[in-house]
Amino acid sequence: MYSVHIYTKYMTNSIDVVVAGAGPVGLLAAIELTLGGARVLVLERLASPSQAMKALSFGPLAGEALLRRGMRTAIDDAQQRSAQAMQAFTQQTGADLRVRASKFNGHFAGLSLIRRDAQVDPDRRPRHVDQPALEAMLAARAQALGIEVRREHEITGIEADDEGVEVSWMSPGGPGRIVAAYLIGCDGGRSTVRKMCDFAFPGTEPTLTFYQATADVDHPERLLPIGWNRTERGVFCYGPVPGRLFMLDFTGPPANRDAPVTREEIEEVLRRTSGQDVRVSALHAASRWADNTRLVDTYRQGRVFLAGDAAHVHSPFGGQGLSLGLLDAANLGWKLAAVIRGDMPESLLATYTAERRPVAEAVLANTRAQVAILRPDPQSGAMRDLIAKLMDFDDVNRYIGEMMTGVSMRYELVASAESHPDVGRLAGDWQLSDGTYLFDAMQDGRGVLLDGTADRRASQRVTTITHQVRCLPVAEGPSWLLRPDACIAWRSEPDCTDELAGLENALRRWFAV
């Protein structure tokens, strides 16, 4: 066992990690930590979950992270509700659902040309669950695990040193404070944690305004077809559920992002971007934001971490932001829990920034590119037409599809020449020989060995080193070691003299006791 640095300033402390923010990223981080044995407290500024319609879906890798934590049925139920809402939309507007179905594979800058038949693994596809539904299912899972979430608790102070982090707050019951070993800021793009702890947040200034709203619109059929519609005045989208509006206004960034979004403002922007004589008769929810694009230099400062929008902000094209944040939580949670348990040295935590920051850099780059070809000027339109033609080529279509879903992501765990090409990739939800699925065996937060050796020698090697890996026999062939986040940490080489070469090194690097 590695010795854990005990934070002695307040010996009455009973919390290992404070998570700031009870949105999807904060809740998943708390779930991961709790499964790993950490004691967690979640502090949330809002009195209740936001019902604003933000993301309508999340990517395949984020969906798989939820499957690994026991939410298969909840996801299926939520997707069924989404399908029913889309059906209601078609009945309301007369839109062709078959057209919408062709767009389920995602898009690049509104170009819904990503083809499932061009993808290497077409079954790894986005999950059509909106953000309020996602947050509800994560909250239910957190409650089932006994995680305490304190709402209307606004963080007012953070003091961190080598022994721990003291977090102060204001709530309806008055001020309070607690000391924990670590703090994770999952509190959004305007993160209090990031600002109070002086994380550098370089990037580019906003140039335009996005609007998203749920509203009643007279003559909604005038806003068809379904999907992204680029005009000389901007971009608009109506659907794919009743009342959902999305507009992109290139006249500049919002003068005051904090000002309430009014019915009149939504109507004016919708009329201008669409060029249609439509009226917004009622506004139920609305938000505006800009395309400021920023990324922290590091995801960790001492005992304070950032995840999700607290660490990176960008334009929302392709629905990548929510998935990016959920995978931050999935990457950090099990590692931090292992350090708190004493199973791993603190040096493991350095891999969080090393693995996740390059992924965010890539997302920031592709969202900037999408903004560039959505602008209404002729030069941007010409580039957009060229990209659309290039997507007719299978290799280009596959590249863009994998970029947008993230399935091509690979962490550099070891030098590429020293390992199998699959090492560093996230495994899919493979069906096992007994008919069960891999992720159903990972719900306890441990790693997994898929042992394809004839005499189960790989399993024997594992059990002598760690109890944090579940061994599953599979048909004779390759063996695989998966971290708790389903990252492939090792794969056997069939033509290697020692087919278990590297297994022990991988076990000690990621699971050592």
List each language-model region with its residue ranges:
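Extreme N-terminal leader/targeting segments of oxidoreductases
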Residues: M1-V17, E32-G36
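C-terminal helical "tail/cap" subdomain of flavin- and related membrane-associated enzymes
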Residues: Y2-M11, K335-G447, G452-T464, G477-P478, ...
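Core beta-strand elements of the Rossmann-like FAD/NAD(P) dinucleotide-binding domain
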Residues: N13-I15, G173-Y182
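Conserved mid-domain beta->alpha element of the FAD-binding
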Residues: G21-A30, L66, L138, G185, ...
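Glycine-rich FAD pyrophosphate-binding loop
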Residues: T34-K54
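Active-site-adjacent segment of FAD-dependent monooxygenases/related oxidoreductases
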Residues: K54, F58-M137, R141, V241
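Conserved FAD-binding catalytic core of PHBH/FMO-like flavoproteins
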Residues: A140, Y182, C186-D291
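A conserved short coil-to-beta-strand element within the FAD-binding core of flavoproteins
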Residues: R151-V165
